[in-house]
Design a protein with these regions (language model features):
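Non-transmembrane, aqueous-exposed alpha-helical and coiled segments at domain scale
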Residues: 1-278
């Protein structure tokens, strides 16, 4: 799992870390070493926008002392605070990043016919404006956030929403339901935080939140992954909002799928049956 480097490098595609991100230099170079050791050559394919902000050692120290909402302790919050406080450090000011720097405006607007895929790092429920505040991240996890890379709205042709067949959360708030099946889902789905290794709390798919996310983001295609996990535990249910009493249960997988497709009748829905890819 990479934390900074876009997935495009695995496919030999030019990949840019945009200005909506914040970058830990030590982690960035560590990931490059790990990828190259695994046979993935990033040279000529990996870039950082000049106006991307940097996570400093001070940001890390400050975040590790804060225990209020169960963050990943990676310095993201303090880095975004300093960005908006106009006292941050940008990638263009770091000599070690010189080989990776790119003018993202020039790159995008000199290739107007290029196909660009924007990859988000976190889910809609963690968005700083639309998530369960204050149990959120410090950045924008929406289509609007992706446009901050310098992409005009009229250029967007497709918006792919990706969601698990169940819902997960890592952090301080109580999220997991009381049913024993959620521990099963966690084990079968290997639901442990990619950054911290903490066990993720699991719950049934929150279809109301998913619908809200689809509407706000203008989702045209919805991918439901980890269906294979639900199949292994053989439990099919959907909840509505945060009310644990509002749950629809299904005895067979196809009924569950049919209900989701009906609920999102204006969106193309794809169910991912494989842990490898769609």
């Amino acid at each position: 799992v990479t934390h900074h480097i876009p997935a495009g490098v695995f496919f030999g595609v030019k990949s840019i870390i945009g200005p909506g991100c914040v970058v830990n230099l030590e982690q960035f170079f560590k990931e490059i070493e790990e990828l190259e050791a695994g046979g993935i050559d990033v040279e000529g394919n990996l870039f950082i926008a000049t106006n991307t902000h940097i996570i400093t050692p001070e940001h890390l120290r400050e975040d590790q002392e804060d225990t209020k909402i169960g963050t990943t302790k990676r310095g993201n919050g303090p880095a975004y605070r300093d960005k908006y406080g106009r006292r941050g450090i940008r990638a263009e000011s770091v000599p070690a990043l010189a080989p990776y720097l790119i003018d993202i405006y020039h790159e995008l607007h000199s290739n107007l016919n290029a196909e660009v895929l924007c990859e988000g790092a976190q889910g809609f429920g963690l968005d700083v404006d639309w998530g369960d505040y204050p149990y959120v991240t410090s950045s924008h996890c929406t289509t609007a956030g992706a446009l901050l890379n310098g992409i005009p709205p009229q250029s967007v042709r497709k918006v792919y929403g990706v969601a698990k067949a169940y819902e997960t959360y890592v952090g301080a708030k109580k999220f997991e339901g009381d049913e024993k099946v959620f521990a099963q889902i966690r084990d079968v789905g290997d639901e442990y935080g990619a950054t911290t290794g903490r066990p993720r709390q699991c719950n049934w798919m929150n279809i109301s939140l998913m619908k809200k996310g689809a509407n706000i983001n203008g989702v045209t295609d919805l991918v439901i992954n980890k269906v294979d996990v639900m199949r292994e535990v053989n439990s099919w249910a959907i909840r509505y909002g945060d009310d644990s009493s509002m749950i629809s249960r299904f005895t067979i997988e196809q009924d569950w799928k049919d209900y989701i497709q009906f609920y999102f009748k204006d969106v193309d829905v794809v169910f991912s049956e494989s842990p490898e890819r769609i």
